[in-house]
Regions:
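Conserved N-terminal glycine-rich FAD pyrophosphate-binding loop of Rossmann-like flavoproteins
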Residues: 30-50
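Glycine-rich dinucleotide-binding loop and its adjacent helix/turn
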Residues: 98-190
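Feature captures the FAD/FMN-dependent oxidoreductase FAD-binding
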Residues: 56-103, 256-264
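A Rossmann-like FAD-binding core segment of flavoenzymes
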Residues: 52-68, 163-267
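Glycine-rich FAD pyrophosphate-binding loop
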Residues: 21-32
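Single conserved hydrophobic/aromatic residue that forms the stacking wall/gate
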Residues: 265-275
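N-terminal Rossmann-like FAD-binding beta1-loop-alpha1 element of flavoenzymes
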Residues: 1-19, 154
Length: 275
């Protein structure tokens, strides 16, 4: 039995069916796409479709029984599942729910959002029938994280800040085209400059240094030379992204508490906290 049919679940299914082992996949949603469906911003359309095809191909195998719209603990208890006598129960329920922020008071903070509902909003707010969570993008936002998902959130906030300034001035404004070209090049074709828009911009707050951002993988058996190259590649990847989307990065910094209407930080790169 495999609980969850997206990336992790379908990978397990592939390995098992390759060995001739029958699988039952239980999925809480209608389709087994997990965060691929709405965890990726809408400009990742080609990647999303490719992943859909991969998962569909695996789940449609003759040795697979797919059970959608079934939640463990709600539609069927874990005790019931345990007593069914499965040879193996594999949990692949993924990151459908954001990990709670360690400073509990932050949830009372105006305009505080977790990544999952934030990206869901971005993917759907333009649809006429949209009735989901509302997000109010403000200037001087901070994004706390350091992986690819947090960079996507920084890109969204920057793109939305620019959209607020120029959408009424550009016929057929296209936020996806702006993502593909980058903010400076997109504005340039309309004789506009980011510096003239009066935007302070988004800041990405990361607790480690840029070389440790998980933007490229480093194999466990990597040589010291390869490790150094991969770390340099991480900084290069981030710098290229900064050039295109113009957000800022505060490395070796993490929030430690709240003070009235702002976050307090500690930074290894400075003697004092900042607010």
């Amino acid at each position: 039995l495999i609980i969850g049919g997206a990336v992790s679940g379908s990978t397990a299914v592939k390995k098992l069916t390759d060995e001739g082992i029958r699988c039952v996949v239980v999925e809480q949603n209608k389709m087994p796409y997990g965060k691929i469906e709405d965890g990726l911003p809408r400009w990742h359309e080609k990647q999303r479709i490719n992943e859909y095809f991969k998962i569909d191909d695996i789940i449609s195998h003759e040795l697979v029984d797919f059970v959608p719209l079934t939640r463990i603990g709600k539609d069927v208890s874990f005790e019931e599942i345990y007593n069914m006598g499965w040879s193996c129960i594999y949990f692949a329920n993924g990151a459908w729910k954001d990990r709670s922020f360690p400073i509990k008071e932050i949830e009372d903070f105006n305009n505080f959002y977790y990544q999952n509902p934030f990206v869901y909003w971005f993917n759907h707010y333009h649809e006429p029938s949209y009735n989901g969570p509302k997000v109010d993008i403000k200037d001087d936002a901070i994004v706390i994280g350091g992986g690819l998902a947090s960079i996507d959130v920084c890109k969204i906030t920057q793109l939305e800040l620019v959209r607020q300034k120029v959408e009424s001035k550009i016929e057929n404004f296209d936020i996806i085209e702006m993502e593909h070209k980058g903010i400076p090049k997109y504005l340039e074709q309309y004789d506009m400059k980011y510096e003239d828009l009066g935007i302070n911009g988004t800041t990405l707050v990361y607790r480690r240094n840029i070389e440790n951002m998980p933007l490229t993988t480093i194999p466990e058996d990597a040589t010291p030379e390869m490790v150094e190259k991969r770390k340099l590649a991480r900084r290069k990847i981030l710098n290229n992204t900064l050039d295109k989307f113009l957000f800022k990065v505060a490395e070796c910094t993490q929030p430690v508490g709240l003070s009235y209407d702002c976050l307090l930080y500690t930074s290894d790169a400075a003697d004092d906290g900042l607010c």
